């Protein structure tokens, strides 16, 4: 996969872990698409994206961004996601593997899939 050839090892590890969590949690009708060297996950519409800082146009200077396309529609009861300047896409930036809260991500993925099934 070309993505892994262009990003440094610390980003590669974070991307790998996030992709594994996502692919294990998404239902069979959801797919992954690599575009611009970035993994996009979608069902009926976009669900989430994993964007390493090394890849241009991601809007972050370091780390790996996990963004939810319809983050504004998620309850996010734990306030895990950053709202930023985008009104729709809410995200979390990971600079280290230890920052990844698997339970929080799974909870958000379940919410996102539930929303996607209503579209």
Each predicted region: which residue ranges?
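Charge-dense, helix-prone N-terminal extensions
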Residues: 1-119
């Amino acid at each position: 996969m070309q993505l892994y050839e262009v990003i440094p090892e610390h980003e590669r590890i974070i991307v790998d872990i996030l992709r594994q969590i996502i692919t294990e949690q998404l239902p069979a009708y959801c797919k992954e698409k690599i575009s611009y060297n970035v993994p996009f996950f979608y069902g009926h519409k976009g669900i989430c994206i994993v964007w390493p800082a090394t890849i241009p146009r991601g809007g972050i200077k370091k780390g790996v961004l996990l963004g939810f396309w319809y983050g504004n529609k998620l309850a996010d009861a734990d306030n895990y996601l950053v709202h930023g300047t985008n009104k729709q896409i809410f995200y979390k930036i990971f600079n280290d593997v230890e920052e990844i809260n698997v339970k929080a991500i799974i909870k958000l993925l379940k919410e996102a899939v539930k929303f996607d099934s209503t579209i």
